[in-house]
Amino acid sequence: MGISSSAPWLKYYDSTPAHLDYPKKTVYEMVRAAADKYPKNIAYEFMGKKTTFAEFMERIDRTAKAFLAMGIGRGDRVTICMPNCPQALDSFYALNRIGAVSNMILPLSAASEIKFYLDFSKSRAILTLDQFYGKVASVLPELENK
């Protein structure tokens, strides 16, 4: 079976390669490499505040140390229930740095959906903001994997 029959959309690709060879690195390692190369460049801007790669790496490293101090480590699953904000980014990359597995869910999910996601992922911990804590806390006693 040729590429055209298994992926017919490829015939519409002009100069776009059908396959990319990605480096064998974690997403944390990729961001770290960018930070090492461009420490003063802006990593992201949130609500008008610009954060450089150097600052971003400091935040990630501090967050990773905090996770380790809480006993979260390699292979642990952690749900991030936050909007798109710096704390979500810090947590995502910090968890990747220590070898934990993060899964991100929408904080506007219904309580029943949050329970489903936590049970399905077998998360060891969940991270959220105070605005969403009540909804998250309401499902904790019902979880299969406590």
Name each model-derived stretch:
Residues 10, 86, 103-105:
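Generic secondary-structure boundary/loop-capping signal
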Residues 5, 35-40:
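A short, compositionally biased
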Residues 17, 43, 49, 100, ...:
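A broad detector of the eukaryotic-type serine/threonine protein kinase catalytic domain
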Residues 1-24:
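Flexible, non-catalytic linker and terminal segments flanking ANL/adenylate-forming cores
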Residues 70, 97-146:
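Structural core segment of the AMP-binding/adenylate-forming
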Residues 21-23, 30-32, 40-85, 89-93, ...:
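Conserved AMP-binding/adenylate-forming core of the ANL superfamily
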Residues 27, 45, 126-128:
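Conserved, well-structured beta-alpha core segment at the onset of a catalytic domain
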